[in-house]
């Protein structure tokens, strides 16, 4: 079982990140919130779960242990598969999820793509009172969430694109590709940010 990957981020796509560990690339499906914190060339630690089915093998990943632990709780709920569980963790943090369950807030849970109100009600019914879930976001000794290196310049450009109406995932991917294709040094210097913003915006406009 592959429980964790530590290596270099080779690329970030809409739903996945490619992590190079010792020359082997692991395509890892991750929540949108985590993908938005990654960029090509960054070192990262990803906590993973390998899902085996009749027709596919999928590696799911998270940037902190709490999210993975809650993910494992969610996929134990009848009718909730790993894709939906990860979708839910892409719309709210473990602590927000725990609060929604405690408050019987099915509407908040149902906002996750692919879940629906019935699935949200099942989660509340089966996980309410779960010790592990209610202790999520606990940064106790030996279990502190991993904090990836943050490139302030990249974040600045991504935020600029988001403010113009682009989705964060699309903005992040465009910035990564613009930097890679134009040999922009990383971490991104503040002087390079306006240029990268123009390059990324041009890429996104062409893709419309």
From Swiss-Prot:
One of its GO terms (molecular function) is ATP binding. SMART domains: HhH1. It comes from the Bacteria. Residues 64-142 are annotated as: Domain II. Pfam families: HHH_5, RuvA_C, RuvA_N. Residues 1-63 are annotated as: Domain I. Its main location: cytoplasm. Coiled coil: none annotated. It is found in: Cytoplasm. Keywords: Cytoplasm, DNA damage, DNA recombination, DNA repair, DNA-binding. Residues 151-208 are annotated as: Domain III. Residues 143-151 are annotated as: Flexible linker. One of its GO terms (cellular component) is Holliday junction helicase complex. Homotetramer. Forms an RuvA(8)-RuvB(12)-Holliday junction (HJ) complex. HJ DNA is sandwiched between 2 RuvA tetramers; dsDNA enters through RuvA and exits via RuvB. An RuvB hexamer assembles on each DNA strand where it exits the tetramer. Each RuvB hexamer is contacted by two RuvA subunits (via domain III) on 2 adjacent RuvB subunits; this complex drives branch migration. In the full resolvosome a probable DNA-RuvA(4)-RuvB(12)-RuvC(2) complex forms which resolves the HJ. The RuvA-RuvB-RuvC complex processes Holliday junction (HJ) DNA during genetic recombination and DNA repair, while the RuvA-RuvB complex plays an important role in the rescue of blocked DNA replication forks via replication fork reversal (RFR). RuvA specifically binds to HJ cruciform DNA, conferring on it an open structure. The RuvB hexamer acts as an ATP-dependent pump, pulling dsDNA into and through the RuvAB complex. HJ branch migration allows RuvC to scan DNA until it finds its consensus sequence, where it cleaves and resolves the cruciform DNA. Belongs to the RuvA family. This is Holliday junction branch migration complex subunit RuvA.
């Amino acid at each position: 079982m592959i429980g964790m990957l530590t290596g270099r981020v080779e690329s970030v796509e809409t739903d996945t990140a490619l992590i190079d560990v010792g020359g082997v690339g692991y395509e890892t499906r991750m929540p949108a919130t985590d993908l938005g914190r990654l960029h090509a060339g960054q070192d990262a630690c990803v906590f993973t779960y390998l899902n085996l089915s009749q027709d596919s093998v999928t590696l799911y990943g998270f940037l902190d242990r709490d999210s993975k632990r809650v993910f494992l709780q969610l996929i134990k709920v009848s009718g909730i598969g790993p894709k939906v569980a990860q979708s839910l963790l892409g719309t709210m943090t473990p602590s927000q999820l725990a609060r929604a369950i405690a408050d019987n807030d099915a509407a908040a849970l149902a906002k996750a793509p692919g879940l629906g109100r019935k699935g949200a009600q099942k989660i509340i019914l089966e996980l309410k009172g779960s010790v592990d879930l209610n202790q999520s976001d606990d940064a106790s000794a030996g279990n502190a969430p991993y904090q990836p290196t943050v490139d302030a310049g990249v974040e600045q450009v991504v935020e600029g694109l988001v403010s113009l109406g682009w989705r964060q995932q699309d903005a992040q991917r465009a910035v990564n590709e613009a930097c890679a294709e134009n040999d922009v040094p990383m971490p991104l210097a503040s002087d390079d940010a306006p240029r990268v913003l123009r390059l990324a915006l041009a890429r996104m406009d062409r893709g419309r």
